[in-house]
Protein backbone atom coordinates (compact mmCIF):
# COMPACT_ATOMS: atom_id res chain seq x y z
CA UNK A 1 0.00 0.00 0.00
CA UNK A 2 1.59 3.33 -0.97
CA UNK A 3 2.13 5.87 1.78
CA UNK A 4 -0.98 7.88 2.58
CA UNK A 5 -0.23 11.59 2.56
CA UNK A 6 -2.35 13.80 4.81
CA UNK A 7 -1.39 17.35 3.99
CA UNK A 8 -2.70 19.61 6.75
CA UNK A 9 -0.57 22.65 5.82
CA UNK A 10 -1.88 22.57 2.25
CA UNK A 11 -5.39 22.94 3.71
CA UNK A 12 -4.49 26.33 5.22
CA UNK A 13 -5.38 29.49 3.22
CA UNK A 14 -3.73 29.75 -0.20
CA UNK A 15 -1.47 32.70 0.62
CA UNK A 16 0.45 30.56 3.16
CA UNK A 17 2.28 28.92 0.25
CA UNK A 18 2.63 28.67 -3.50
CA UNK A 19 1.71 25.49 -5.34
CA UNK A 20 4.69 24.37 -7.41
CA UNK A 21 5.95 21.14 -8.93
CA UNK A 22 9.60 20.14 -8.57
CA UNK A 23 11.67 20.67 -11.74
CA UNK A 24 12.95 17.37 -13.19
CA UNK A 25 16.69 16.63 -13.37
CA UNK A 26 18.75 14.99 -16.13
CA UNK A 27 19.90 11.64 -14.73
CA UNK A 28 19.07 11.02 -11.09
CA UNK A 29 20.97 8.40 -9.13
CA UNK A 30 20.23 7.38 -5.54
CA UNK A 31 23.26 8.00 -3.34
CA UNK A 32 21.73 7.05 0.01
CA UNK A 33 18.33 6.15 1.47
CA UNK A 34 17.78 6.12 5.24
CA UNK A 35 15.88 2.87 5.79
CA UNK A 36 15.91 3.18 9.60
CA UNK A 37 14.25 6.62 9.47
CA UNK A 38 11.77 5.41 6.83
CA UNK A 39 10.65 2.65 9.18
CA UNK A 40 10.34 5.12 12.06
CA UNK A 41 7.98 7.39 10.09
CA UNK A 42 6.06 4.53 8.46
CA UNK A 43 7.26 4.71 4.84
CA UNK A 44 9.36 2.41 2.65
CA UNK A 45 11.93 2.82 -0.10
CA UNK A 46 9.19 1.57 -2.45
CA UNK A 47 7.08 4.63 -1.59
CA UNK A 48 9.96 6.90 -2.61
CA UNK A 49 11.71 5.60 -5.72
CA UNK A 50 14.63 7.59 -7.13
CA UNK A 51 12.40 9.48 -9.59
CA UNK A 52 10.30 10.81 -6.71
CA UNK A 53 13.35 11.69 -4.58
CA UNK A 54 14.78 13.62 -7.54
CA UNK A 55 11.56 15.52 -8.24
CA UNK A 56 11.06 13.81 -11.62
CA UNK A 57 7.80 12.20 -10.48
CA UNK A 58 5.25 12.90 -7.77
CA UNK A 59 4.03 10.25 -5.34
CA UNK A 60 0.29 9.68 -5.18
CA UNK A 61 -1.36 12.05 -2.71
CA UNK A 62 1.46 14.62 -2.70
CA UNK A 63 0.47 18.30 -2.91
CA UNK A 64 3.77 20.06 -3.60
CA UNK A 65 4.01 23.57 -2.16
CA UNK A 66 6.69 26.16 -1.40
CA UNK A 67 6.09 27.80 1.98
CA UNK A 68 5.90 31.57 2.48
CA UNK A 69 7.84 33.11 5.35
CA UNK A 70 9.80 36.25 6.23
CA UNK A 71 12.67 36.74 8.66
CA UNK A 72 15.42 38.68 10.31
CA UNK A 73 18.73 37.74 8.69
CA UNK A 74 21.65 38.78 10.90
CA UNK A 75 19.22 41.21 12.53
CA UNK A 76 18.08 42.81 9.25
CA UNK A 77 14.38 42.52 8.34
CA UNK A 78 13.45 40.76 5.08
CA UNK A 79 9.65 40.83 4.51
CA UNK A 80 9.56 37.94 2.03
CA UNK A 81 11.88 34.94 1.95
CA UNK A 82 10.04 31.62 1.52
CA UNK A 83 11.18 28.29 0.10
CA UNK A 84 13.40 29.39 -2.77
CA UNK A 85 14.79 25.95 -3.55
CA UNK A 86 12.62 23.52 -1.66
CA UNK A 87 9.24 21.91 -2.16
CA UNK A 88 7.13 20.31 0.56
CA UNK A 89 5.68 17.15 -1.02
CA UNK A 90 3.29 16.63 1.87
CA UNK A 91 2.91 15.09 5.31
CA UNK A 92 2.85 11.48 6.44
CA UNK A 93 1.55 10.27 9.78
CA UNK A 94 3.88 7.73 11.40
CA UNK A 95 2.96 4.58 13.31
CA UNK A 96 3.16 6.61 16.54
CA UNK A 97 0.55 9.07 15.24
CA UNK A 98 3.11 11.85 14.78
CA UNK A 99 3.04 13.96 11.65
CA UNK A 100 6.16 14.35 9.46
CA UNK A 101 6.84 16.75 6.58
CA UNK A 102 8.61 15.29 3.53
CA UNK A 103 10.47 18.06 1.72
CA UNK A 104 12.77 18.05 -1.32
CA UNK A 105 15.66 20.54 -1.18
CA UNK A 106 17.33 21.57 -4.43
CA UNK A 107 14.19 20.73 -6.39
CA UNK A 108 14.20 23.77 -8.68
CA UNK A 109 12.92 27.36 -8.69
CA UNK A 110 9.78 28.60 -6.95
CA UNK A 111 8.16 32.05 -6.79
CA UNK A 112 10.39 32.66 -3.74
CA UNK A 113 13.69 31.95 -5.53
CA UNK A 114 14.55 35.60 -6.13
CA UNK A 115 17.66 35.34 -8.35
CA UNK A 116 18.56 31.79 -7.32
CA UNK A 117 18.42 28.69 -9.52
CA UNK A 118 16.53 26.64 -6.93
CA UNK A 119 19.17 23.93 -7.01
CA UNK A 120 21.51 22.43 -4.40
CA UNK A 121 25.11 21.30 -4.66
CA UNK A 122 26.17 17.86 -3.47
CA UNK A 123 28.47 19.24 -0.73
CA UNK A 124 25.80 21.00 1.36
CA UNK A 125 23.46 18.00 0.88
CA UNK A 126 26.12 15.68 2.31
CA UNK A 127 26.82 18.10 5.16
CA UNK A 128 23.14 18.25 6.11
CA UNK A 129 22.74 14.47 5.82
CA UNK A 130 25.75 13.76 8.05
CA UNK A 131 25.19 16.47 10.66
CA UNK A 132 21.41 16.06 11.05
CA UNK A 133 21.77 12.28 11.48
CA UNK A 134 24.66 12.80 13.92
CA UNK A 135 22.53 15.22 15.95
CA UNK A 136 19.71 12.66 16.06
CA UNK A 137 22.16 10.01 17.33
CA UNK A 138 23.33 12.50 20.00
CA UNK A 139 19.70 12.79 21.15
CA UNK A 140 19.29 16.42 20.03
CA UNK A 141 15.96 17.41 18.41
CA UNK A 142 16.56 17.87 14.70
CA UNK A 143 15.19 17.59 11.21
CA UNK A 144 16.29 14.32 9.60
CA UNK A 145 17.73 13.05 6.34
CA UNK A 146 15.64 10.56 4.36
CA UNK A 147 17.69 10.49 1.16
CA UNK A 148 20.15 12.18 -1.14
CA UNK A 149 20.11 11.83 -4.92
CA UNK A 150 22.72 13.06 -7.40
CA UNK A 151 21.18 14.80 -10.40
CA UNK A 152 23.74 14.33 -13.17
CA UNK A 153 23.71 18.12 -13.57
CA UNK A 154 26.15 20.80 -12.50
CA UNK A 155 25.17 23.77 -10.37
CA UNK A 156 27.23 26.91 -10.77
CA UNK A 157 28.43 28.52 -7.55
CA UNK A 158 32.01 29.88 -7.23
CA UNK A 159 32.75 26.97 -9.58
CA UNK A 160 30.62 24.27 -11.23
CA UNK A 161 29.66 21.64 -8.65
CA UNK A 162 27.77 18.34 -8.87
CA UNK A 163 24.06 18.82 -8.17
CA UNK A 164 21.93 16.95 -5.64
CA UNK A 165 18.42 16.77 -4.25
CA UNK A 166 18.15 16.20 -0.50
CA UNK A 167 15.02 14.80 1.16
CA UNK A 168 14.40 16.33 4.57
CA UNK A 169 11.97 15.06 7.20
CA UNK A 170 10.75 17.47 9.89
CA UNK A 171 7.98 17.68 12.48
CA UNK A 172 7.05 20.74 10.43
CA UNK A 173 8.77 23.49 8.46
CA UNK A 174 6.99 26.29 10.33
CA UNK A 175 9.43 28.93 11.54
CA UNK A 176 9.30 32.09 13.62
CA UNK A 177 9.60 33.76 10.22
CA UNK A 178 6.29 32.16 9.17
CA UNK A 179 4.51 34.12 11.91
CA UNK A 180 6.45 37.25 10.96
CA UNK A 181 5.31 36.96 7.34
CA UNK A 182 1.63 37.26 8.28
CA UNK A 183 2.18 39.74 11.12
CA UNK A 184 4.05 42.13 8.81
CA UNK A 185 1.02 42.09 6.49
CA UNK A 186 -1.34 42.87 9.36
CA UNK A 187 -3.23 39.65 8.57
CA UNK A 188 -4.87 38.70 11.87
CA UNK A 189 -6.98 35.92 10.35
CA UNK A 190 -3.85 34.28 8.97
CA UNK A 191 -2.07 34.62 12.32
CA UNK A 192 -5.04 32.98 14.05
CA UNK A 193 -5.14 30.14 11.54
CA UNK A 194 -1.38 29.58 11.82
CA UNK A 195 -1.45 29.68 15.63
CA UNK A 196 -4.34 27.18 15.77
CA UNK A 197 -2.48 24.91 13.34
CA UNK A 198 0.74 25.03 15.39
CA UNK A 199 -1.08 24.40 18.66
CA UNK A 200 -2.96 21.42 17.22
CA UNK A 201 0.20 20.03 15.64
CA UNK A 202 2.94 20.75 18.18
CA UNK A 203 1.54 22.08 21.47
CA UNK A 204 -1.96 20.62 22.02
CA UNK A 205 -1.68 21.35 25.76
CA UNK A 206 -1.89 25.09 24.93
CA UNK A 207 -5.41 24.77 23.51
CA UNK A 208 -7.13 24.56 26.90
CA UNK A 209 -5.26 27.52 28.41
CA UNK A 210 -6.92 30.90 28.97
CA UNK A 211 -4.78 32.57 26.29
CA UNK A 212 -3.59 29.80 23.94
CA UNK A 213 -1.21 32.13 22.05
CA UNK A 214 0.54 33.02 25.32
CA UNK A 215 0.78 29.35 26.29
CA UNK A 216 2.21 28.59 22.84
CA UNK A 217 4.94 31.19 23.37
CA UNK A 218 5.86 29.71 26.75
CA UNK A 219 6.05 26.14 25.44
CA UNK A 220 8.01 27.13 22.33
CA UNK A 221 10.42 29.17 24.48
CA UNK A 222 11.06 26.20 26.76
CA UNK A 223 11.84 23.99 23.77
CA UNK A 224 14.21 26.59 22.30
CA UNK A 225 15.99 27.08 25.62
CA UNK A 226 16.52 23.36 26.07
CA UNK A 227 17.58 22.92 22.44
CA UNK A 228 20.24 25.63 22.56
CA UNK A 229 21.56 24.20 25.84
CA UNK A 230 21.92 20.81 24.13
CA UNK A 231 23.78 22.42 21.21
CA UNK A 232 26.25 24.15 23.46
CA UNK A 233 26.94 21.06 25.55
CA UNK A 234 28.32 19.25 22.49
CA UNK A 235 30.12 22.33 21.11
CA UNK A 236 27.67 22.87 18.24
CA UNK A 237 27.50 26.27 16.54
CA UNK A 238 24.44 26.66 14.31
CA UNK A 239 26.01 29.58 12.46
CA UNK A 240 22.91 31.21 11.01
CA UNK A 241 20.25 31.62 13.72
CA UNK A 242 18.02 33.90 11.67
CA UNK A 243 14.33 33.88 12.61
CA UNK A 244 13.56 31.99 9.40
CA UNK A 245 15.88 29.21 10.65
CA UNK A 246 14.17 28.99 14.04
CA UNK A 247 11.74 26.04 14.00
CA UNK A 248 8.55 26.52 15.98
CA UNK A 249 8.68 22.80 16.84
CA UNK A 250 12.03 23.25 18.60
CA UNK A 251 14.06 21.18 16.15
CA UNK A 252 17.50 22.10 14.80
CA UNK A 253 16.88 23.16 11.19
CA UNK A 254 19.08 24.41 8.34
CA UNK A 255 22.62 23.15 8.61
CA UNK A 256 24.24 25.60 6.15
CA UNK A 257 27.39 26.96 7.82
CA UNK A 258 27.14 24.96 11.06
CA UNK A 259 30.23 23.58 12.78
CA UNK A 260 31.45 21.87 15.93
CA UNK A 261 34.04 23.58 18.11
CA UNK A 262 37.51 22.02 18.02
CA UNK A 263 39.73 24.18 20.25
CA UNK A 264 37.30 25.74 22.65
CA UNK A 265 36.51 29.44 22.80
CA UNK A 266 33.09 30.96 23.67
CA UNK A 267 33.49 33.54 20.89
CA UNK A 268 34.12 30.84 18.28
CA UNK A 269 32.54 31.52 14.87
CA UNK A 270 32.94 29.45 11.69
CA UNK A 271 30.33 30.91 9.34
CA UNK A 272 32.04 32.94 6.62
CA UNK A 273 29.11 35.38 6.55
CA UNK A 274 29.01 35.98 10.33
CA UNK A 275 31.51 38.83 10.25
CA UNK A 276 30.65 40.26 13.68
CA UNK A 277 30.28 37.03 15.64
CA UNK A 278 26.52 37.52 16.13
CA UNK A 279 25.99 33.75 16.20
CA UNK A 280 29.12 32.68 18.13
CA UNK A 281 28.97 29.59 20.41
CA UNK A 282 28.43 31.67 23.55
CA UNK A 283 25.93 34.10 21.95
CA UNK A 284 23.40 31.43 20.96
CA UNK A 285 21.11 31.69 24.03
CA UNK A 286 20.89 35.47 23.67
CA UNK A 287 19.96 35.12 19.98
CA UNK A 288 17.34 32.44 20.67
CA UNK A 289 15.81 34.80 23.25
CA UNK A 290 15.79 37.64 20.70
CA UNK A 291 14.11 35.36 18.12
CA UNK A 292 11.40 34.52 20.66
CA UNK A 293 10.83 38.24 21.24
CA UNK A 294 10.04 38.50 17.51
CA UNK A 295 7.58 35.60 17.89
CA UNK A 296 5.96 37.31 20.89
CA UNK A 297 5.38 40.47 18.85
CA UNK A 298 3.54 38.39 16.25
CA UNK A 299 1.35 36.66 18.85
CA UNK A 300 0.57 39.81 20.85
CA UNK A 301 -2.47 40.85 18.73
CA UNK A 302 -4.11 37.48 19.51
CA UNK A 303 -4.36 38.31 23.23
CA UNK A 304 -7.99 39.23 24.07
CA UNK A 305 -7.05 41.74 26.81
CA UNK A 306 -5.84 45.31 26.54
CA UNK A 307 -2.52 45.91 24.79
CA UNK A 308 -0.93 46.88 28.10
CA UNK A 309 -2.09 43.70 29.88
CA UNK A 310 -1.07 41.58 26.92
CA UNK A 311 2.39 43.13 26.76
CA UNK A 312 2.94 42.53 30.49
CA UNK A 313 1.93 38.87 30.25
CA UNK A 314 4.05 38.22 27.16
CA UNK A 315 7.06 39.93 28.77
CA UNK A 316 6.66 37.78 31.88
CA UNK A 317 6.79 34.62 29.75
CA UNK A 318 9.83 35.85 27.81
CA UNK A 319 11.59 36.79 31.04
CA UNK A 320 11.53 33.12 32.09
CA UNK A 321 13.75 32.16 29.15
CA UNK A 322 17.18 32.91 30.69
CA UNK A 323 16.38 30.79 33.76
CA UNK A 324 14.99 27.94 31.67
CA UNK A 325 18.11 27.96 29.53
CA UNK A 326 20.45 28.24 32.54
CA UNK A 327 18.74 25.31 34.26
CA UNK A 328 19.09 23.03 31.22
CA UNK A 329 22.65 24.15 30.50
CA UNK A 330 23.87 23.90 34.11
CA UNK A 331 22.30 20.46 34.58
CA UNK A 332 24.01 19.36 31.36
CA UNK A 333 27.39 20.70 32.48
CA UNK A 334 26.92 18.82 35.75
CA UNK A 335 26.37 15.57 33.84
CA UNK A 336 29.44 16.22 31.66
CA UNK A 337 31.51 16.61 34.85
CA UNK A 338 29.86 13.65 36.56
CA UNK A 339 28.33 15.71 39.39
CA UNK A 340 25.52 13.40 40.44
CA UNK A 341 23.74 15.67 42.95
CA UNK A 342 23.70 19.40 42.13
CA UNK A 343 25.26 21.60 44.81
CA UNK A 344 26.03 25.30 45.22
CA UNK A 345 29.42 26.00 43.69
CA UNK A 346 29.00 23.55 40.80
CA UNK A 347 28.48 26.32 38.27
CA UNK A 348 31.66 28.09 39.39
CA UNK A 349 33.55 24.82 39.01
CA UNK A 350 32.22 24.41 35.46
CA UNK A 351 32.86 28.04 34.54
CA UNK A 352 36.44 27.87 35.83
CA UNK A 353 36.98 24.84 33.62
CA UNK A 354 35.56 26.52 30.49
CA UNK A 355 37.79 29.55 31.13
CA UNK A 356 40.78 27.22 31.38
CA UNK A 357 39.83 25.37 28.17
CA UNK A 358 39.46 28.70 26.34
CA UNK A 359 42.75 30.11 27.64
CA UNK A 360 44.68 27.06 26.50
CA UNK A 361 42.55 26.37 23.39
CA UNK A 362 41.89 22.79 24.43
CA UNK A 363 39.82 20.52 22.18
CA UNK A 364 36.30 20.56 23.69
CA UNK A 365 35.12 17.04 22.83
CA UNK A 366 38.45 15.35 23.46
CA UNK A 367 38.81 16.97 26.89
CA UNK A 368 35.48 15.65 28.18
CA UNK A 369 36.17 12.29 26.57
CA UNK A 370 39.49 11.99 28.41
CA UNK A 371 38.05 13.28 31.67
CA UNK A 372 35.49 10.45 31.41
CA UNK A 373 38.31 7.97 30.71
CA UNK A 374 40.09 9.22 33.83
CA UNK A 375 37.05 8.40 35.98
CA UNK A 376 36.73 5.00 34.30
CA UNK A 377 40.39 4.09 34.83
CA UNK A 378 40.93 6.08 38.06
CA UNK A 379 44.27 7.01 36.50
CA UNK A 380 45.01 10.58 35.45
CA UNK A 381 48.21 9.74 33.57
CA UNK A 382 46.65 6.90 31.58
CA UNK A 383 43.68 9.01 30.39
CA UNK A 384 45.90 11.52 28.58
CA UNK A 385 43.87 14.47 29.82
CA UNK A 386 47.08 16.24 30.90
CA UNK A 387 48.51 16.12 27.39
CA UNK A 388 45.79 18.48 26.15
CA UNK A 389 47.22 21.40 28.15
CA UNK A 390 50.35 23.27 27.15
CA UNK A 391 50.70 24.28 30.78
CA UNK A 392 48.92 21.84 33.10
CA UNK A 393 49.28 23.84 36.33
CA UNK A 394 45.85 25.49 36.03
CA UNK A 395 44.25 22.16 35.18
CA UNK A 396 45.90 20.46 38.16
CA UNK A 397 44.46 23.09 40.49
CA UNK A 398 41.00 22.72 38.93
CA UNK A 399 41.26 18.91 38.96
CA UNK A 400 42.00 18.88 42.69
CA UNK A 401 38.76 20.84 43.35
CA UNK A 402 36.78 18.58 41.01
CA UNK A 403 38.11 15.40 42.62
CA UNK A 404 37.29 16.74 46.06
CA UNK A 405 33.75 17.58 44.87
CA UNK A 406 33.22 14.06 43.48
CA UNK A 407 35.11 12.10 46.16
CA UNK A 408 31.97 10.89 47.96
CA UNK A 409 30.32 9.63 44.74
CA UNK A 410 30.19 6.09 43.39
CA UNK A 411 32.76 6.11 40.58
CA UNK A 412 30.73 3.59 38.53
CA UNK A 413 27.65 5.84 38.58
CA UNK A 414 29.82 8.85 37.83
CA UNK A 415 31.44 7.14 34.84
CA UNK A 416 28.05 6.04 33.47
CA UNK A 417 26.66 9.58 33.75
CA UNK A 418 29.71 11.06 32.02
CA UNK A 419 29.72 8.43 29.25
CA UNK A 420 26.11 9.30 28.40
CA UNK A 421 26.85 13.06 28.37
CA UNK A 422 30.21 13.16 26.58
CA UNK A 423 30.23 11.89 23.00
CA UNK A 424 33.36 10.25 21.67
CA UNK A 425 32.49 10.97 18.05
CA UNK A 426 31.10 14.22 16.63
CA UNK A 427 31.00 15.37 12.97
CA UNK A 428 34.39 17.02 13.04
CA UNK A 429 34.69 19.77 10.46
CA UNK A 430 37.77 18.31 8.74
CA UNK A 431 36.10 14.88 8.41
CA UNK A 432 33.05 16.52 6.82
CA UNK A 433 35.28 18.38 4.35
CA UNK A 434 37.08 15.12 3.55
CA UNK A 435 33.75 13.36 2.85
CA UNK A 436 32.47 16.24 0.69
CA UNK A 437 35.69 16.54 -1.34
CA UNK A 438 35.71 12.79 -2.00
CA UNK A 439 32.00 12.75 -2.93
CA UNK A 440 32.57 15.53 -5.47
CA UNK A 441 35.01 13.09 -7.14
CA UNK A 442 32.32 10.35 -6.98
CA UNK A 443 34.07 8.55 -4.11
CA UNK A 444 31.33 8.04 -1.52
CA UNK A 445 33.34 5.80 0.84
CA UNK A 446 34.28 8.56 3.34
CA UNK A 447 30.62 9.73 3.47
CA UNK A 448 29.37 6.21 4.23
CA UNK A 449 32.12 5.64 6.80
CA UNK A 450 31.37 8.91 8.59
CA UNK A 451 27.67 7.99 8.84
CA UNK A 452 28.56 4.57 10.25
CA UNK A 453 30.86 6.03 12.94
CA UNK A 454 28.51 8.87 13.93
CA UNK A 455 25.51 6.55 14.33
CA UNK A 456 27.08 5.39 17.65
CA UNK A 457 28.58 8.57 19.12
CA UNK A 458 28.89 7.39 22.73
CA UNK A 459 30.40 3.94 22.03
CA UNK A 460 34.04 2.92 21.88
CA UNK A 461 34.84 1.93 18.29
CA UNK A 462 38.41 0.57 18.38
CA UNK A 463 38.65 0.27 14.59
CA UNK A 464 37.53 3.88 14.13
CA UNK A 465 39.54 5.59 16.86
CA UNK A 466 41.04 8.00 14.31
CA UNK A 467 37.64 9.67 13.99
CA UNK A 468 37.95 10.88 17.61
CA UNK A 469 40.94 13.02 16.80
CA UNK A 470 40.97 16.76 16.27
CA UNK A 471 42.38 18.00 12.97
CA UNK A 472 46.11 18.11 12.33
CA UNK A 473 47.41 21.64 11.75
CA UNK A 474 46.94 21.35 7.97
CA UNK A 475 43.35 20.05 8.31
CA UNK A 476 41.84 22.80 10.48
CA UNK A 477 38.63 24.24 9.01
CA UNK A 478 38.49 27.97 9.79
CA UNK A 479 35.33 28.91 7.88
CA UNK A 480 32.14 27.23 6.70
CA UNK A 481 29.81 28.36 3.93
CA UNK A 482 26.06 28.36 3.40
CA UNK A 483 26.27 26.52 0.09
CA UNK A 484 23.09 28.14 -1.19
Model-identified regions with their sequence ranges:
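Short, functional N-terminal and low-complexity linear motifs
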Residues: 1-8, 19-21, 97-102, 161-166, ...
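Regulatory N- and C-terminal appendages and interdomain linkers associated
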Residues: 1-69, 275-484
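Short, mixed-charge, low-aromatic patches
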Residues: 8-12, 86-90, 150-155, 246-255, ...
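Active-site-adjacent bridging/hinge elements
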Residues: 9-13, 100-110, 195, 199, ...
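Short, contiguous strand/loop micro-motifs
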Residues: 21-23, 117-119, 214-215
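Conserved ATP-binding subdomain of kinase catalytic cores across diverse folds
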Residues: 27-30, 35-209, 248-251, 291-292, ...
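ATP-dependent phospho-/nucleotidyl transfer catalytic cores
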Residues: 125, 154-238, 249-355
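Hydrophobic HxD+1 residue recognition
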Residues: 240-241, 246
